[in-house]
């Protein structure tokens, strides 16, 4: 999760000072700097013809999503620079979260994500061709 919160969409949401360093990035990719200081994770998504974009964002006690698009598939952006989740949906989510954090009664977490006590997945690289029923059982044993 640290990779997403530090370097992925979360890093982009928290980054401030863009106005001094990269005007194009600030105005075209993020819309404006959000300057969140807390841990945030998220994932953007885009349809192949740039008619839909979405962003799913999360903090430790809240997951929310924003979808931008239309039912008529012929309506779409001609260019991926504007027709993607990062430029269509992410700015809406950022504004929503900024406003949500202004209301302490909502109790939205600004803490770090809890670290799991133990995450362990055994790998047997020498026996990659094991039968699929064994693979399925292994995944079920892990809770998947």
Language-model features: where?
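A penicillin-recognizing enzyme superfamily signal
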Residues: 1-128, 142
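Secreted/processed peptides and extracellular or luminal domains of membrane proteins
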Residues: 130-133
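Extended acidic low-complexity intrinsically disordered regions
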Residues: 135-144
